[in-house]
Regions:
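The Walker A/P-loop phosphate-binding site
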Residues: 2-106, 288-289
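C-terminal regions of RecA-like/P-loop NTPase motor modules
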Residues: 11, 61, 146-162, 189-197, ...
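Helical mechanochemical/support elements of P-loop NTPase systems and associated helical scaffolds
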Residues: 13, 37, 68-69, 91-95, ...
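Cytosolic-facing regulatory segments adjacent to core modules
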Residues: 43, 75-158, 172-173, 271-274
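Hydrophobic positions in the central parallel beta-sheet of the AAA+
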Residues: 55, 137, 162-164
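Conserved H-loop
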Residues: 88-90, 199, 204-206
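Helical hairpin unit composed of two closely spaced alpha helices linked by a short loop
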Residues: 160-203
Length: 290
């Protein structure tokens, strides 16, 4: 005797997803996607970062990790999603100083020494006007434990992107026996934080396994160390490679490869950026629509 046909239950999540796809205009990005403001990167990532994703950004010392993280934060804020930027190395004044340099295309030392020309002063003035109304909040990455640090996000509303600079300064939820175990535990909790708060979480990371003496200095996933945790918990891994750091005078000043070493929901590869070191500003090297 044939068994009775199985009656499938309704799946509201599936139904909602299908409705969303049907309603989406061709080429439009989904509502949970947050463009980074760097067109070439957004194109490779299918529109940008996605809410609930954990994104790592690593690179050698002095490669511009914090500058790129701040540049992304500013560009996201200009598109209206709120941004929270937690820094373990700079207070709000120093971060705003860097933001003025990036947006005003002026060197930080000129800001500090007040040696601005009429042209750069005008650039700073215009940058100040743009920055004043941006929905970006700077917070200290300091506290006795993980929960204390991230409770500071509770009063914030409409936040789409949270930036943490940097991973190794985040206090672990509880003490483990080694630094690697602490960092792996922090990554697991950061991923849970992204899921629970429905934000894209961009985390700057040092590379404990990086060796600048090797033949190819492009960072790899193995350079992130920490018991393979990035491979397990990160949805996207971005790595900065600037050849001028290893080949000075080689005619490649400013040229930057931003490697997408892991992309859970799409392709890997790299995009070409240009780094204006005096301004700590990254720009797309090529038209992303080419």
């Amino acid at each position: 005797m044939p068994s009775p046909a199985r009656k499938f239950e309704k799946r509201p999540t599936l139904d909602n997803l299908v409705e969303k796809v049907d309603a989406q205009r061709p080429g439009a990005i989904t509502g949970d996607t947050i463009p980074t403001g760097y067109g070439s990167l957004d194109k490779l990532l299918g529109g940008g970062f996605r809410r609930r994703d954990l994104i790592l950004l690593g690179g050698d010392v002095g490669s511009g990790k914090s500058a790129l993280a701040l540049g992304i934060a500013l560009r996201v804020a200009q598109q209206s999603p709120g941004v929270a930027f937690l820094s373990g190395e700079m207070n709000e004044e120093r971060l705003m100083e860097r933001a003025l340099a990036i947006e005003g295309r002026v060197a930080v030392d000129e800001l500090r020494a007040a040696t601005l020309t009429d042209q750069t002063r005008a650039g700073v003035g215009g940058a100040a006007v743009r920055l004043r109304g941006l929905p970006i909040t700077f917070l200290p990455l300091a506290g006795e434990d993980f929960e204390t640090v991230f409770e500071r996000l509770d009063p914030l509303r409409q936040v789409g992107l949270v930036v943490v600079d940097y991973l190794q300064l985040v206090p672990p939820p509880r003490e483990r026996t080694t630094q690697d175990e602490d960092t792996a535990l922090v990554l697991r909790h950061l991923k849970a934080l992204a899921l629970n708060r429905q934000v894209a979480l961009l985390v700057v990371a040092q590379l404990p396994g990086f060796n600048a003496a090797r033949a190819d200095q492009r960072p790899t996933l193995n350079d992130y160390g920490v018991l393979g945790a990035p491979k397990q918990h990160a949805d996207v891994v971005l790595s900065i490679f600037r050849e001028e750091m290893y080949n000075p005078g080689g005619g490649v000043d400013g040229a930057t490869e931003l490697l997408v070493s892991k992309n859970r929901n799409g392709p890997t590869g790299f995009v070409d950026l240009y780094f204006y070191r005096r301004w700590m500003r990254f720009e797309d090297m090529l038209d992303p629509d080419r």
